[in-house]
Amino acid sequence: YHYIDGGPKSDQAAIQKIIETSEVPCTSVVLREENYGVGRNLIGARRDLFDLHGYERVILIEDDLIPGPNFIKTTLSLADWAKSYNDVGMVQVWNLPHREITEIDLDVVEPTHEHFYSYCIDVRVWNEIKETIYAYESQYLQGVSYANKDWRAIRKKFMKPRYTENRIMRESPLLLPSDFEHPAPFGKRLKRTVPTGQDAITALALWEKGFVRIATLAPRAVMKGVDGVHSTAEV
């Protein structure tokens, strides 16, 4: 599915023609009625795939990554394995190792708050976190450009209350011990510079519902350049 923003300066017809005449796989082209921006497009795409089209699993890969030959296979295998645990909400096979990786690390996973360059999520998890994400979308992304969203209100009125509420604890079977303290995505206190985009809200929604995101210690993809194309990997 290809999503093309609309708006006064858009050229949807030309972009659609490029897509349809290229060799890029294309199921359908969705023409937005206005300029959605990255946040609403990513939320809307997950809404379409899960809520509208009934997909059971979605893998997201940003253009900052170059997937390795076993990227998809390993992602799907890890997701299948993780379904046995009620506390795993997302899996990913990309990571930023903080030490040298050896062959014995190939099967090691760890909980992470690393950047959302890539992840895999199942519909059962999406159904639990989407209410938070949709509330964020309707309150702060409608009728305003993504760059001009009210980040102060998002942090103070939307994110902070979720930090002070008791985090849901999942029932067994659990991957992590019941006494494991999985920190909130942005530390114990929300700083003024905390991210407020849809990735941040997705991470917060996972955390408040008691989920963790796990990543293979050994990355199955490499970043373009040193720090990717358009964002910083470390939050």
PLM segments and residue spans:
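Short glycine- and hydrophobic/aromatic-rich loop-to-beta-strand nucleating segment
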Residues: 117-124
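Conserved donor NDP-sugar-binding/catalytic core segment of glycosyltransferases
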Residues: 65, 70-106
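Short beta-strand segments
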Residues: 1-3, 92-94, 215-217
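Short beta-strand-to-loop acidic/aromatic patch adjacent to the donor-nucleotide binding site
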Residues: 54-66
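A short, glycine-/small-residue-rich helix N-cap motif at loop->alpha-helix starts
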Residues: 33-41
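Acidic donor-binding segment of Leloir-type glycosyltransferases
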Residues: 1-30
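C-terminal catalytic/acceptor-binding lobe
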Residues: 142-235
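Active-site nucleotide-sugar/metal-binding loop of Leloir-type enzymes
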Residues: 43-57
